[in-house]
Amino acid sequence: MFKNKEQVMVVPVNYVSNVGNKFKLNETLTLQQSYCHYDSLGVYRPLYEIENNICFIRISTMLIIKNQYNEYLVKELHDKQKRPCLELGIHSYVKPQSGNYQAIYNQLIASTRNYFDVDLNFEYLGTIRDLANDNVKSILGNVYIAEINKNDFILKTKHDLYENKWYSKQELIDKYNKATSWSKIMIDIIVEELI
């Protein structure tokens, strides 16, 4: 049996036991602190070791990108059953090449390079977790937003498996049922105007 040896950052699950379901707005951490929050406790483990391990939780970054026209970057793709679905923003696990210091910041920079040729300014919004979904229960996402001028950036739009597009708030609402679990939580945040 093939084992996926890709490594991702994890922390002990009891460290994040106070993080409830859905979205928790940040009220205490500065942007700089959010980058370093898991540095001392985070360790890198192969995915196959932690897939169903209840002792650890994977740390990921979620970046919402908004332009001056109040449009949001989405990724249109097909899921494992070949059904069309969409992801809001950029999601990625924190990987070893991100290092042990400011690993979250380094991962944000690395993941945005797949979309834009310049660095973005991030704002830390809070954390996201979906305790109702077995597929993502063991993942905790740090949520950031970056606002850009659409005219100043070249969006790398085409990929073999998906296409990057800009959606208005109304388009997000209209295609809500096609959104991934985490994207639905973030769309709820946008609709409720928490950001």
Question: Which role does the model predict for each range below?
Answer:
Residues 110, 114, 118:
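Acidic, glycine-rich loop-and-strand cores that form catalytic or ligand-binding grooves
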Residues 61-63, 124, 142-146:
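A structural signal for short, well-ordered beta-strand segments
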